């Protein structure tokens, strides 16, 4: 069955280990598509095993745009993503390709569909200032500081979410205005119809896959990958890249804070918690086509409907 382009953008969403990438590749085998990654971990170079990044042969045959675009120490925001993804969508339509945005980072999808507020950009000086504050005070105390400045933002942000806490404080420091006030006006980034597909296997199946995949990662050199990252003096535990599930626990193990068995258990639990958060977000999405298992035929029928 041929597929209709019709200037439509496809969101292929799902929790971790749901099979999104495999389904996207199957669609690329049959149709002229442009795969655009929507994953805040896959952007980083040198983080391949722990992020379940498609291997180099697969990426060469079926390119995924917005993978390997940053070093782990680099800053990359939802604004950066929205701008880059929008450029890829425009390129897709110019080449008569169907843009398929595939991933599980809800904030990135939300930014594209609903837009972002215009916030002051980080500077190296402000970034360093708040990194030092994070090291000296910790997330809980910084979260209390944020409560005094912007209660609305503090109520939305988890007390352990170091990245979002420091960003909210940084925004106030740079602009003199609270994050909540600046987030008032938003405009959608995408000005095209969006069709949303959610791949949602049973929870028990996802939990089993998560455990099996992490154990497989361990067998395929995940700890060596993290050891290599630790050789970079610019990397530390509070960076977004190192806070990715699996990497944080491996980092703690290599620093002697936990033993290997505890590291494996904590990494699997953290990934299952991520899966739960993703499922909560996905259940709130409206006007979606839900699949329990990958079916290219059903997806094409939905896209053409």
From Swiss-Prot:
Binding site for substrate: 16-21
Entry EC number(s): 2.5.1.75
Coiled coil location: none
Cofactor(s) required for function per UniProt: Mg(2+)
Keyword Translocase appears in the UniProt entry: no
Pfam families, alphabetized: IPPT
Taxonomy, superkingdom: Bacteria
Keywords recorded for this protein, A-Z: ATP-binding, Magnesium, Nucleotide-binding, Transferase, tRNA processing
Site for Interaction with substrate tRNA, residues: 105
Residues involved in ATP binding: 14-21
Gene Ontology process terms (BP): tRNA modification
Region (Interaction with substrate tRNA): 39-42, 163-167, 243-248
A single GO molecular function term of this UniProt record: tRNA dimethylallyltransferase activity
The protein's enzyme class: transferase
Record's catalysed reaction(s): adenosine(37) in tRNA + dimethylallyl diphosphate = N(6)-dimethylallyladenosine(37) in tRNA + diphosphate
Transferase in keyword set: yes
Subunit structure: Monomer.
Membership in a protein family: Belongs to the IPP transferase family.
Task performed by this protein: Catalyzes the transfer of a dimethylallyl group onto the adenine at position 37 in tRNAs that read codons beginning with uridine, leading to the formation of N6-(dimethylallyl)adenosine (i(6)A).
Name of the protein this chain belongs to: tRNA dimethylallyltransferase
Organism: Ruthia magnifica subsp. Calyptogena magnifica
């Amino acid at each position: 069955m041929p597929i209709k382009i019709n200037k439509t953008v496809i969101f292929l969403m799902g929790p971790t280990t749901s099979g999104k990438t495999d389904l996207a590749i199957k669609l690329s085998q049959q149709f002229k598509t442009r795969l655009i990654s929507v994953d805040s971990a896959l952007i980083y170079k040198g983080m391949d095993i722990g992020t379940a990044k498609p291997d180099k042969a697969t990426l060469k045959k079926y390119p995924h745009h917005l993978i390997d675009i940053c070093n782990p120490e680099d800053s990359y925001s939802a604004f950066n993503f929205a701008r880059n993804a929008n450029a890829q969508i425009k390129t897709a339509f110019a080449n008569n390709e169907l843009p398929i945005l595939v991933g599980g980072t809800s904030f990135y999808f939300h930014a594209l569909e609903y837009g972002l507020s215009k916030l002051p950009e980080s500077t190296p000086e402000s970034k360093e200032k708040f990194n030092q504050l994070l090291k000296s005070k910790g997330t809980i105390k910084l979260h209390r500081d944020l409560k005094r400045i912007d209660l609305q933002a503090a109520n939305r942000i988890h007390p352990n979410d170091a990245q979002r806490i420091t960003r909210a404080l940084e925004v106030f420091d740079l602009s003199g205005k609270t994050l909540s006030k600046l987030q008032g006006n938003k405009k959608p980034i995408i000005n095209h119809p969006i069709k949303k597909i959610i791949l949602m296997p049973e929870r028990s199946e996802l939990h089993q896959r998560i455990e099996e995949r992490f154990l497989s990662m361990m067998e395929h050199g995940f700890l060596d990958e993290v050891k290599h990252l630790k050789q970079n003096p610019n990397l530390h535990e509070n960076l977004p890249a190192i806070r990715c599930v699996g990497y944080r626990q491996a980092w703690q193990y290599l620093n002697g804070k936990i033993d290997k068995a505890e590291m494996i258990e904590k990494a699997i639990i953290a990934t299952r918690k991520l899966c739960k958060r993703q499922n909560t977000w996905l259940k709130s999405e409206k006007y979606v086509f839900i699949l329990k298992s990958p079916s290219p035929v059903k997806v094409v029928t939905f896209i053409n409907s």
